[in-house]
A protein has these predicted regions:
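Carbohydrate-active catalytic/glycan-binding domains of CAZyme proteins
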Residues: 22-209
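Bacterial Sec-dependent N-terminal signal peptides
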Residues: 1-26
Length: 209
């Protein structure tokens, strides 16, 4: 009986220790492709900063056996050598945008003047269709917070060019040599617009490509 009790206690302690280790151990060695094999990720966007590469991706939590997707949050992974990676847990969730109802779709992060701006695709809460929001952080790994309190681009801003509700997706950002920043996005119809230096406002009309 004593041996059985010892075995149960040992097993419980080992299980608890293993769970704690797995929870705290966020660094792993990539073993071929896909790089991230312990969870489902989608729509990766990469950024290089201070000798490290960062990958920002949506986290697909759809439970089996459903054959769809469930994206409520984004992940960020960093690597100094493209082999050893570290996950920095939950830098941003779709619900961090009070005006959004969910769906953490494709996104892109860029650095400017020591701040990191994350342009994301979400479903708007009151304006039907996909919208683009922007979050900001002092660190490439977050945490990030809504930089505006409202969407940067909404579906009703582009109905002149297409009637679909999901054309305002997949944002990316480019800063030209003269310092002018541009936002690019689209689906079936592509768009671009200049950004103000604060990186959270459009600086001119939306131009179809």
């Amino acid at each position: 009986m004593i041996n059985k009790i010892r075995f149960v206690v040992f097993s419980f302690a080992l299980t608890a220790f293993s769970g704690l280790s797995a929870q705290n151990d966020t660094t792993f060695i990539a073993n071929g492709n896909p790089i991230i094999q312990y969870k489902y990720t989608a729509d990766p966007g990469a950024m290089v900063h201070d000798g490290k590469v960062y990958i920002y991706a949506g986290h697909d939590e759809c439970p089996p056996p459903k054959e769809h997707y469930l994206l409520n949050e984004w992940c960020v992974f960093s690597s100094p050598d493209m082999k050893t990676w570290t996950e920095h847990p939950v830098p941003l969730k779709a619900k961090d945008f009070s005006w959004a109802k969910g769906e953490a779709w494709a996104s892109q992060v860029i650095e400017r003047d020591g701040k990191f701006y994350w342009y994301v695709t979400v479903e708007h809460n009151t304006i039907p269709g996909k919208s683009i929001g922007v979050a900001v952080s002092d660190s490439p790994t977050g945490p990030f917070a809504d930089a505006r309190g409202s969407a940067l681009v909404t579906n009703d801003m582009t109905t002149e060019y297409t009637k679909i509700r999901w054309d305002d997706i997949d944002p990316t950002v480019f800063i030209d040599d003269d310092g002018q920043a541009y936002l690019y996005w689209g689906n079936t119809q592509c768009y671009y617009a200049r950004l103000k230096k604060n990186m959270i406002e459009l600086d001119g009309p939306i131009i179809p490509v």
